[in-house]
Amino acid sequence: MKEVLKRGMLKFENSFFSHVVRCALGMIIPLVLTGGISCAVRDFPVAPYQMFLTQGGGRWFYDFLTMVYEGTYGIFSVALVITIAYSYAMEKNESLENVVMYVVVALAAFSAQLNLGTEDFDVAGLGTTGCFAAMFIGYLSCMAFSKLRRCHKLMLEQYTAGMGGGCVLAIRTLIPLGIVAAGSGGVNLLIGRITGIYGCYQWFNHIFYAACQNIADYSNFLSGLLYTFAVNLMWFFGLHGSHILEAVAVHNFGVTGNVVFSKAFYDVYVAMGGCGTTVSVLIALLLFFRKERTGKLAGLASFTVVFNLNEMLTFGIPIILNPILLVPFVLTPVVCYCLAYAATVCGFLPVLTHEVVWSTPVGIGGYLASGSWKGIAVQAVGILAGILFYLPFLKINQRMEVYKAKRHVQVLIHELQEKEEQIDQPVFLTRGDHIGMISRMLLLDLKHAIKNKELYMLYQPQVYSDGICIGAEALLRWNHPVYGMICLLYTSDAADDLIGV
C-alpha cells in the first residue's frame, strides 16, 4: 500500500500539469514579494507611523509604496498568463521562437474574456482577482494551440516556403492563434448572454458569492468554515484563494461587530504566516530541520513570513501541488479557525469590531484584534497545534524529497550514459524541461563544491596477478549532500560547461 501511494504521489508531482503550474508560479515570486513587502511597509499598524505617512511629510513615501503595490499585484494575472505559457512551451522543449508564440496566444485568449472596450471591463481582472482565469485560460489556450499546430492544413506552410525572416513562424501560426483567441472570446460571449455575467473570473466569484451568502444566512460558523477551507484548497493548487475570493469576503465577511467570523478574523487567527498557517511550518523547520535544505530555506523566508508572505516556503519546499502536505495545509487553518471561533463564542475573546491589516505580524495582530494578551494566547495555541499537525507530514516529505532527488539524478545520469554510448554530445543545460532544470541546479552545486574544495580523488591500484603494482587509476569523486555520489560522467561534462561560464 505504501509503495502504491508513493508511486501515485510521484506520478502526480511529475505530471506535465504539475511541472508547468509550479514553475510558472515560482517565476512570479519576486513580483509577489515586492508587492507584498511594499504593502506591509505601507500599512504597518503603528499610529504615529501611519500619521506620518498619511498626514505628515511622508505622504510621498505612502504614494510610492502604493504605486509599487499596484504595479505588481495590479498585473498579477497578466504576469501569470505569460509564465504559464512560457513554462508550458519550455516543458514541451520548444524553440525560443515557439515559446514567444505560446505567450502571444495565451495573452490573446486571456484578453478576449476581459471584455476590453466594453462597459463590462473591470481592471481588477488584470490583478490578483483574475488569477484563476489566468491560470485556467493560459493553460487551456496553450494546450489548444499545441494541438492545432499539428494540423498541417492550418499552418499555411505552402505560403511560407522559401521565405526568410522572423515573420515565417508568425504567418504559419496565424490560423491556430486566431482560432484560440476567437474561441475564448466566443465562449465568454455565449456564457455572458446566458447568465448575464461576462468574464471568467466574474463567473467564479458569482458562484462562490451565492454559495457563501446562502450559508451565511443559515450559519456564520459554516460560512466561515467553507471560506477557510476553500481559500486554502485553492492555494494548494497555486491559486491565490484570498485574492480570488476578495470580492466575496468584502460582501459577506466585513467587520460588523455582530458576528464572530469576518475577513479580519481570518487574517488574524487563521492565516498566520500566510495561507496554510505556514508560520507553523516555519517554526517546525527551524526547530527540527535546521541542517536540511528546507530548514535553510525557512531561515531565508523568516522575514517575509513574519508579514504573512509565504511564497518562498510554499514554492520552495514545495507545498503547492505537493500531495504529501495537502492534508495539513488545508486542515491546519480549519483547526485554527475552530479554536478561535470557540474561544470567541465562549467569551474568552471579544468579537472583532475593527479591521486589522492582513500583513500585520503574528502577536501584534492578536493584540490589536483583542486589545489584550488573550488574542496572542489564542494565536499561540493555534500555532502550536499547527506545528504538531505538520511535523509528521514534514518528516515524510523530507524522506520523499531525498528519494525523488536521487531518482531525478538517476534519470539524468541514465540519459547521459546513453549519449556517451552513442558518441553524442549531451546538451542538458539548455533544455527547458525538468531534466534541464536539474542539470542547471547541479551545475550551480558543482561551482559551490569546487569553490569549497569538496571534490576529491580516489586512487585505484592496478595490480598484476603476481601481486606487483604497476600503477594506479585516478578517480574524481563528488559526494553531493543530497544526491550522494555523482557519476563521473556528469561531473566531467558539467566541468566542461563551467570552463565556458
Regions found by a protein language model. Give the residues of each.
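Helix-loop-helix hairpins and the membrane-proximal interhelical loops
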Residues: 40-63, 190-274, 286-289
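Helix-loop-helix junctions within the multi-pass membrane cores of secondary transporters/permeases
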Residues: 249-329
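Membrane-interface helix-loop-helix junctions at boundaries between adjacent transmembrane segments
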Residues: 116-222
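Single conserved hydrophobic/aromatic residue that forms the stacking wall/gate
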Residues: 490-501
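Active-site core of bacterial EAL-family cyclic-dinucleotide phosphodiesterase domains
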Residues: 426-488
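Transmembrane alpha-helical segments and their short flanking loops
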Residues: 2-12, 51-57, 256-261, 314-420
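Early transmembrane hairpin of solute transport permeases
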Residues: 10-156, 320, 329, 334
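Cytosolic juxtamembrane regulatory segments of multi-pass membrane proteins
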Residues: 170-177, 311, 316, 412-435
